């Protein structure tokens, strides 16, 4: 005897036709997405000197590039939305938020889908991060590579976004309502790129009255307060342990260099050149110095009064768009603590550039480190600043309207990938590119990791933003 289940629909002709229509709707949506992805056409100026064949290859490069990240999704819809969002970041749209991208590339019905991509769909974050670093290392790795750490702020008007609070905002130069994140950049003679980030949560976000806001912003329950310096060390550790990137140097500004605990926990087998404030106290090792300064210490700014102590020399830092960039440098061995032990001995590097504002930096590099090496590393601070400037102005780094913890980090990752694609594109064609001819990059450009790539979705050329048109986002001038 067959028992009917009232919860199951009867297999009537009307029901079967409805199911068929539903399947046809799914197929229609997939075909429409395929057409949208295929309609993306590049618009490159003559400055890039790309032939018609090269222009067609741009689409192939994007299709191949995005294919390496398909494994992070597991479903067709989020994979296609990932490609759509990446195209939007690379488009000519003035705003790069989800609504603007959807309206430009597909229409208002796609806005909700992109929102789900950033906040609801499952991503294998670890897999995407691993592949991101793998492709970046293939493009940038060099023994002269330098890591840079820095914070960047994003002004906000409301109070609902994750991590927003009154705090110092570098973008405005004052305390303001904003979010702040810690970022890691890797630079080499081949170019530079942002590789990871972490949103900073001010202490107030861990107070009881913020419990509901933490829940609404989907902050992981086990998240605890950490300083920006602690976040930077957490971000650096897996990158260094991956052994994919050459170079032992790490640079940071005063917000990191002035924190002794941060420098004391520095990763082994690496050197830092960290900027410090002019009021930072040191103990001089050299002779001919006031006995009081040797015992009680002095500020680094006070050392300027001892003329025989500093041997100023002019050095070329890099080649700029308007000619060589030069500055005067001096250095002296100091102790960074009153203990004055060999373990606390450091290089103090002084730099006087065109602004005539002297900058100071400490380094744990060995005593026999050449001056030209310190000069080279001191010039490696600008790549991360340029990344911020160009990613915000061209790739929508600060155009997001997400409020959750997950969406903030996903947005940053997608912007990093868009930036990396532009770098790969420029190295690939080597037209109007500033690539070190002595590098190990093959003559035919970037070679993706030697693993089997997943089958690409239909994703052909499209309109690039002004930065993409220049095809020079990630390379020095």
Regions found by a protein language model. Name each.
Residues 149-153, 256, 369-402:
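Short amphipathic alpha-helical "interface-anchor" segments enriched in bulky aromatics
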Residues 85, 356-381:
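Extended, non-catalytic structural segments that build the interaction scaffolds
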Residues 11, 15-77, 201, 208, ...:
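A short, flexible helix-boundary coil/loop motif
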Residues 62, 79-86, 98, 358, ...:
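Short runs of predominantly hydrophobic/aromatic residues within well-ordered alpha helices
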Residues 94, 110, 353-358, 365-370, ...:
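Short acidic (Asp/Glu) and glycine-rich catalytic loops that position anionic groups and cofactors
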Residues 34-251, 255-299, 329-334, 345, ...:
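Conserved, well-structured functional cores that handle cations and Mg-NTP chemistry
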């Amino acid at each position: 005897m067959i028992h009917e289940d009232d919860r199951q629909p009867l297999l009537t002709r009307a029901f079967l036709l409805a199911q068929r229509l539903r399947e046809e709707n799914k197929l229609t949506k997939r075909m429409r997405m395929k057409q949208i992805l295929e309609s993306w056409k590049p618009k490159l100026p003559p400055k890039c000197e790309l032939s018609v064949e090269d222009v067609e290859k741009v689409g192939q490069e994007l299709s191949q590039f995005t294919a390496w990240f398909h494994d992070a999704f597991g479903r067709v819809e989020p994979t296609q939305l990932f490609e759509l969002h990446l195209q939007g970041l690379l488009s000519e749209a003035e705003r790069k938020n989800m609504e603007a991208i959807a309206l430009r590339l597909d229409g208002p019905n796609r806005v909700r889908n992109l929102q789900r991509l950033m906040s609801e769909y499952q991503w294998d974050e670890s897999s995407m991060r691993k592949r991101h670093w793998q492709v970046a290392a293939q493009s940038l790795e060099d023994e002269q590579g330098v890591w840079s750490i820095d914070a960047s702020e994003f002004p906000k008007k409301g109070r609902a976004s994750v991590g927003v609070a009154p705090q110092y905002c570098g973008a405005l130069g004052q305390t303001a309502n904003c979010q702040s994140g810690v970022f890691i950049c890797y630079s080499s003679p081949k170019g530079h790129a942002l590789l990871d980030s972490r949103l900073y949560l001010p202490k107030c976000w861990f107070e009881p009255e913020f419990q509901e806001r933490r829940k609404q912003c989907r902050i992981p329950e086990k998240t605890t307060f950490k300083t920006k310096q602690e976040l930077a060390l957490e971000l650096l550790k897996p990158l260094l342990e991956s052994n994919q990137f050459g170079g032992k140097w790490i640079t940071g500004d005063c917000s990191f260099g002035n924190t002794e605990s941060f420098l004391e926990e520095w990763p082994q087998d690496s050197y830092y050149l960290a900027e410090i404030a002019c009021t930072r106290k040191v103990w001089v090792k050299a002779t001919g110095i006031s006995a009081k300064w040797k015992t009680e210490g002095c500020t680094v700014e006070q050392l300027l009064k001892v003329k025989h102590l500093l041997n100023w020399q002019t050095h070329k830092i890099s080649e700029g768009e308007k000619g060589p960039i030069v500055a005067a440098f001096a250095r002296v061995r100091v102790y960074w603590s009153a203990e004055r032990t060999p373990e606390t001995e450091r290089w103090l590097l002084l730099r006087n550039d065109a602004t005539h504002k002297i900058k100071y930096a400490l380094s744990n590099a060995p005593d026999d480190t050449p001056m030209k090496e310190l000069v080279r590393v001191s010039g490696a601070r600008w790549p991360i600043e340029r990344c911020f400037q160009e990613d915000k102005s061209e790739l929508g780094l600060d155009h997001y309207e997400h409020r959750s913890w997950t969406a903030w980090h996903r947005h940053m990752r997608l912007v990093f990938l868009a930036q990396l694609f532009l770098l790969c594109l420029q190295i690939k064609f080597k037209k109007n590119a500033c690539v070190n001819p002595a590098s190990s990059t093959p003559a035919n450009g970037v070679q993706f990791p030697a693993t089997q790539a997943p089958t690409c979705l239909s994703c052909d050329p499209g309109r690039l933003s002004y930065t993409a048109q220049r095809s020079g986002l990630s390379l020095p001038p």
